[in-house]
Amino acid sequence: MDVGTKSYISHQEQKMTATVEQIESWIVDVPTIRPHKLSMTTMGCQSLVIVRLTRSDGICGIGEATTIGGLSYGVESPEAILSAITHYLTPLLKGQPADNLNALTARMNGAIKGNTFAKSAIETALLDAQGKALGLPVSALLGGALQTALPVLWTLASGYTAKDIAEGEKLLAEGRHRAFKLKIGARELATDLRHTRAIVEALGDRASIRVDVNQAWDAATGAKGCRELAAMGVDLIEQPVSAHDNAALVRLSQQIETAILADEAVATAYDGYQLAQQGFTGAYALKIAKAGGPNSVLALARVAQAAGIGLYGGTMLEGTVGTVASLHAWSTLPLQWGTEMFGPLLLKDDIVSVPLTFADGQVALPQTPGLGVELDEDKLHFYTRQP
């Protein structure tokens, strides 16, 4: 064996034996640009759990886990996510080979039930570090990007019709967005329908209008509400009924002309399989946090594709780190309904050194190794929650 070959093999062995050396995590509280009103809460601040994973070869990867309104959306709060990472996932992964993502995912899932938000932050950091080690963007590690700029909508959720219309007009004039989602379900059905109709009439000839009910309606209200939303020209209706009422969701998808988007009803590939098996015909909102990470979420996407169900890139209103991690996954898929990865735009500040670029109704996917973004250490320190 010549010297060159020995050197190459030694280099490869060093790369292959890099291990997880350290995992740090913080809760970072960033104010929003305005109150963001959903059916279950109103947000004035977003709490991001930021992770930095350091390998034995010195390469660092970053990740993020973010939920909505503390415990308003799901079973993991920022505090619980931080605790799971600190006390359970970190001891489990320290010293393990850092470049075998499937083995590490199996290790996490085998030892720790649920906690997909925390696992997603770790999976993201592992992918970021691996991409940097190989000189490849995360999208390449996930099979390769089909597109380097992805459509992104904006949510009109001030809670006031006139304000939402004015905000939509401004964004259309700027050319930043071509689709809007309305948050409804917190008020009486008639009030929500009047609010939606006014916005459709004001903006619907220039933009796609969708609504998100966030599970607020029972089956009867859902049937009535969805029929009226379809009649007024709404393009997509997201999770109108409880995540536990698959039967009603399936009926709506089969009976309403407007597409129904399942969000809270689908987190894992098995959820997607069950809903498809029951006859659901709409679309699935993919979210890396619900599935366990940018790689793990692709299993749900494959189930949807096999069943002929559309795909939509969903958000937990993440900051830039979580948003770009999602974008790398979404870029590998045909997204019939685009994405809603506007999270960073909802925040008053950004904790990365170079923000993402939003223009012409799209967001650009970074092409540099790893996620393609780096933390601004000063801002990270400034917004980190103190004990």
Indicate residue ranges for each PLM-predicted region:
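N-terminal capping/lid subdomain adjacent to the active-site entrance of alpha/beta enzymes
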Residues: 6-209, 214-216, 220-223, 227-231, ...
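Hydrophobic faces of well-ordered beta-strands that scaffold small-molecule active sites
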Residues: 152-156, 178-182, 207-213, 237, ...
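Shared catalytic-loop signature of beta/alpha-barrel
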Residues: 227, 233, 244-261, 266-362, ...
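Intrinsically disordered, low-complexity segments enriched in proline/serine/threonine
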Residues: 7-9, 242, 336
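Active-site-proximal loop/turn and secondary-structure-junction residues that shape catalytic pockets
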Residues: 158, 184-188, 215-217, 241-243, ...
